[in-house]
């Protein structure tokens, strides 16, 4: 597996990557020969050679089908896993190469910092006239919050992710130029050990993960990766500011984290009041345990003796106070440590943390008290020649406490608007509640939302579940503090009545503070094209409502709105979704400003382009002026979490990129573009006609039958990827009821990737026919929004394969002749206009590194896809009863996901 097509050319900086891929590819070959047989390796090589030849000659997939069809399920599974293992090592090599390139930039000492990093952002800001004073005034307004979700798009189980980390560590160690030959041999042995253990581990769990499993999975990234790199992020920022401006102001907290795991009830009956309480408790235990361990290490480090160095009087006073507060813990102090006040104070701080965990006397009442203790130690060290005797390590812990508090990550709660509406209708005994217009419902809800009247309690299941949720939130606020709770998100929000409903239910559930207000940030989520269009009217109605405005005043006159990238794309296609999101932000900002409210956005992005994925820096550059304003809250879903935060060095890079992008977009937003006034109608036309084409396709008679036959959606629904069902419970198989994640996942597996491009060509053609070709070319050149949109579509197109998609389509029988020509024609139209407007002869011509990465993978994905089609046809012939075929199909899904590096 170490030969390459001659046409694959690596740029000079990427030659080490080429060498790694060759070396690791050879290692995969050795693994296959050892674990299966030499004959099996020979067979893999024959298939691989055929796949490469087929790509080079643009031959049909039938050349592969002859070698692959009709295999026994176990043989097919082994073959798929062989190619998947190749993807695994290539993905690892590419991640390690990113670390290598980062180190090369840092070592170079040149005036050109790594693009999109903090040094790059600050140099660009200074070049644009930003002074240190202006930067210092802005820093307290910066608030970057990645929010981790448990959507079922992570197709790799944790046991394999952990082994992947071992492989990464061995390769990173090998980057050290001082390694001896024996050490390099040891590095290779460690890599092979982890790779072999991975081969002997099943790709997926036989049971669906619980909410607790998902919580543990996300907690791994928070406690094992981000906990480690957060202080380094601030140190990097300090270094960048000092290098750019000569001095460093005191840095506020810029980063925090959120999570939906345990709080996302939308469509998931496994999430309720118990998981909310359990998640908050588990996160509290996890982060306090980390603090205790770190304080233990600090106690050993801070062994300064009063016979040799002084400590501050304030620290000695605190030590005596803690001895009185925690007499049992003080009595356990070792006499030989009596002259080590830092060590003694650290021991008592650990005892306070244990009391906090146990809800016992002497507990910290808030993270700020622990911060004060750490600051006391820092001040004493600084005043007594201790800057190089532990100050650095103590400050790292202080940054962690500021970032993670006692809660680790803020927990959001989400539920669909219809669930709230049904509960209120039952409580009020109004069977026609849904039939009443929003204005009438808002008027009825007003007295309950403001507390003038009590919403009646009823004992049905829906009301009982919601009452328990709000009671759990009230208890959590008391026990864990307000910082532990994020937002309450209303999915499928349509009007102000949906928001007032939550306010009324929260009051009934007891979520009321001492001032009589509901201490909850309620966030409407606009996620269909129509709701995005109507979002401005909804927010205007909401902010004009006296009851809600009173609530908002108690929340600092700041309103958050969540924008749904996934469902809007499924609803109207990617062009309408992107443009609807762009317009909605502009209009919502204007409406909120007119009413004296600060509006912030929560971006519900997924991993794939169809669901809003892509580089954060480019997304913020393309965002409307003023839409960032120091704040970035964005979901991190599924495989994105692993890709961005699975390795510490890359997690640090991701945090730097987000923070740098927010600084640039906030302090020096893009200059106003007068031409946008005439570009917008052109984009309106593109979006409108794109939607017409997209909906004509997905709303055609028998389309859902075609979708279910021409994609492996039935396999995906049988996989144990997450705790949430793929379809809203109790609803039929209509497209509107299918979750956006499996929708995108299925089309990606079938290599048609419909959600990422369908309709775009028709929209662009309509604009050209209307005489706007020059405007489109101008937009592609000078409008970051449109350029980013086209680049994203180009990337999706480059990952698709029409020939493979046709194999899947033929599984639909007679429906193939009706639907596949539409796909083929729209694809040709889209690809033609995207290349023309980007002025490229081939897709991704401007991004040769990404193009090379995709070309490296495609010949290895093709055999898996061809096998997948054959296995799918045979499995369906058994009515989905053959478990051996299903296991092989699951291996195919995992293999294609590894190759494409995205799922849903």
UniProtKB/Swiss-Prot annotation:
EC nos: 4.1.1.31
Catalytic residue positions: 151, 570
GO cellular component, one term: cytosol
Stored Gene3D superfamilies: Phosphoenolpyruvate/pyruvate domain (1.20.1440.90)
Gene Ontology biological process terms, A to Z: carbon fixation; oxaloacetate metabolic process; tricarboxylic acid cycle
Enzyme class: lyase
Catalytic reaction(s) noted: oxaloacetate + phosphate = phosphoenolpyruvate + hydrogencarbonate
A Pfam family reported for this protein in Swiss-Prot or TrEMBL: PEPcase
Co-factor(s): Mg(2+)
Domain of life: Bacteria
Region (Disordered): 52-71
UniProt-listed InterPro entries: PEP_COase (IPR021135), PEP_COase_bac/pln-type (IPR022805), PEP_COase_Lys_AS (IPR018129), PEPCASE_His_AS (IPR033129), Pyrv/PenolPyrv_kinase-like_dom (IPR015813)
An annotated Gene Ontology molecular function: phosphoenolpyruvate carboxylase activity
Keywords: Carbon dioxide fixation, Lyase, Magnesium
Function according to Swiss-Prot or TrEMBL: Forms oxaloacetate, a four-carbon dicarboxylic acid source for the tricarboxylic acid cycle.
Family: Belongs to the PEPCase type 1 family.
Protein name (record): Phosphoenolpyruvate carboxylase
């Amino acid at each position: 597996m170490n030969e390459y097509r001659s046409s694959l050319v690596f740029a000079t900086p990427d030659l080490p990557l080429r060498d790694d891929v060759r070396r690791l590819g050879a290692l995969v070959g050795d693994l296959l020969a050892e674990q299966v047989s030499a004959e099996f390796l020979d067979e893999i090589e024959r298939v691989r050679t055929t796949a490469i030849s087929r790509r080079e000659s643009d031959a049909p997939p039938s050349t592969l089908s002859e070698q692959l069809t009709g295999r026994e399920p176990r043989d097919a599974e082994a073959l798929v896993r062989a190619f998947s293992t190749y993807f695994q090592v290539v993905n690892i090599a590419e991640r390690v190469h990113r670390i290598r390139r980062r180190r090369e930039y840092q070592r170079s000492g040149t005036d050109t910092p790594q693009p999109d990093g903090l040094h790059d952002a600050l140099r660009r800001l200074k070049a644009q006239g930003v002074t240190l004073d202006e930067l210092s005034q802005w820093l307290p307004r910066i608030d970057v919050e990645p929010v981790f979700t448990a959507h079922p798009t992570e197709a790799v189980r944790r046991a394999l992710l952990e082994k992947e980390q071992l492989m990464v560590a061995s390769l990173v160690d090998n980057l050290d130029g001082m390694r001896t030959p024996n050490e390099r041999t040891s590095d290779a042995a460690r890599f092979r050990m982890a790779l072999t253990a991975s081969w002997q581990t099943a790709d997926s769990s036989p049971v669906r993960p619980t909410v607790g499993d998902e919580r543990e999975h996300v907690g791994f990234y928070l406690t094992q990766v981000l906990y480690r790199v957060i202080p380094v992020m601030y140190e990097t920022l300090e270094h960048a500011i000092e290098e750019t401006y000569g001095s460093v102001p005191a840095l506020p907290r810029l980063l925090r984290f959120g999570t939906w795991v345990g709080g996302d009830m939308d469509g998931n009956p496994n999430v309720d009041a118990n998981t909310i309480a359990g998640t908050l408790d588990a996160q509290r235990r996890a982060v306090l345990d980390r603090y205790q361990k770190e304080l233990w290490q600090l106690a050993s480090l801070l062994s300064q003796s009063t016979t040799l160095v002084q400590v501050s009087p304030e620290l000695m006073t605190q030590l005596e106070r803690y001895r009185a507060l925690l007499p049992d813990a003080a009595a356990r102090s070792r006499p030989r440590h009596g002259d080590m006040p830092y060590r003694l104070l650290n021991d008592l701080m650990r005892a306070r943390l244990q009391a906090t965990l146990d809800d016992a006397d002497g507990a910290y009442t808030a993270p700020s008290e622990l911060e004060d203790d750490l600051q006391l130690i820092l001040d004493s060290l600084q005043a007594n020649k201790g800057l190089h005797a532990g100050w650095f390590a103590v400050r790292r812990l202080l940054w962690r406490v500021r970032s993670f508090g006692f809660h680790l990550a803020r927990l959001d709660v989400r539920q669909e608007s219809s669930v709230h509406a049904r509960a209120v209708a039952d409580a009020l005994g109004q069977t026609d509640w849904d039939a009443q217009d929003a204005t009438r419902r808002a008027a009825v809800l007003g007295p309950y939302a403001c507390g003038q009247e009590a919403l009646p309690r009823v004992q049905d299941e829906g009301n009982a579940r919601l009452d328990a949720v709000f009671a759990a939130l009230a208890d959590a606020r008391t026990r864990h503090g307000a910082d532990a709770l994020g937002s309450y998100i209303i999915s499928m929000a349509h009007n102000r009545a949906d928001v007032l409903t939550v306010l009324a239910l929260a009051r009934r559930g007891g979520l009321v503070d001492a001032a009589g207000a509901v201490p909850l940030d309620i966030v409407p989520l606009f996620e269909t094209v129509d709701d995005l269009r109507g979002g401005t009217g909804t927010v205007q109605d909401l902010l004009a409502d006296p009851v809600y405005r009173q609530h908002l005043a108690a929340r600092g006159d700041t309103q958050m709105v969540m924008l749904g990238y996934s469902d809007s794309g499924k609803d109207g296609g990617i062009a309408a979704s992107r443009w609807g999101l762009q317009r909605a932000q502009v209009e919502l900002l204007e409406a909120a400003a007119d009413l004296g409210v600060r509006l912030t956005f929560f971006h519900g992005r997924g991993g794939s382009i169809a669901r809003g994925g892509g580089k954060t820096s480019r997304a913020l550059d393309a965002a409307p002026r003023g839409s960032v304003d120091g704040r970035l809250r964005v979901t991190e879903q599924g495989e994105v979490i692993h890709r961005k935060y699975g390795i510490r060095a890359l997690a640090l890079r991701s945090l730097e990129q987000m923070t740098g992008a927010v600084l640039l977009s906030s302090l020096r937003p893009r200059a106003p573009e007068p031409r946008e006034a005439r570009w917008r109608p052109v984009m309106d036309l593109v979006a409108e006609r794109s939607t017409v084409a997209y909906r004509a396709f997905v709303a055609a008679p028998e389309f859902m039958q075609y979708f279910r036959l021409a994609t492996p959606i039935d396999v995906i629904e049988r996989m144990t990827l997450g705790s949430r069902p793929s379809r809203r419970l109790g609803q039929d198989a209509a497209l509107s009821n299918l979750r956006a994640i499996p929708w995108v996942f299925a089309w990606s597996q079938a290599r048609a990737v419909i959600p990422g491009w369908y309709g775009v060509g028709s929209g662009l053609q309509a604009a050209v026919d209307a005489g706007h070709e020059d405007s489109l070319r101008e937009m592609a050149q000078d409008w970051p929004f449109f350029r980013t949109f086209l680049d994203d579509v180009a990337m999706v197109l480059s990952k698709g394969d029409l020939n493979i998609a046709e194999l899947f389509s033929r599984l639909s029988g007679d429906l193939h002749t009706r639907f596949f020509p539409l796909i083929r024609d729209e694809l040709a139209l889209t690809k033609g206009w995207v290349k023309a407007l980007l002025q490229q002869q081939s897709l991704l011509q401007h991004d040769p590194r990404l193009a090379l990465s995709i070309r490296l993978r495609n010949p290895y994905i093709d055999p898996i896809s061809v096998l997948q089609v054959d296995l799918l046809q045979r499995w369906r012939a058994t009515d989905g009863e053959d478990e051996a075929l299903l296991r092989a199909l699951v291996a195919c899904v995992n293999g294609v996901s590894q190759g494409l590096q995205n799922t849903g």
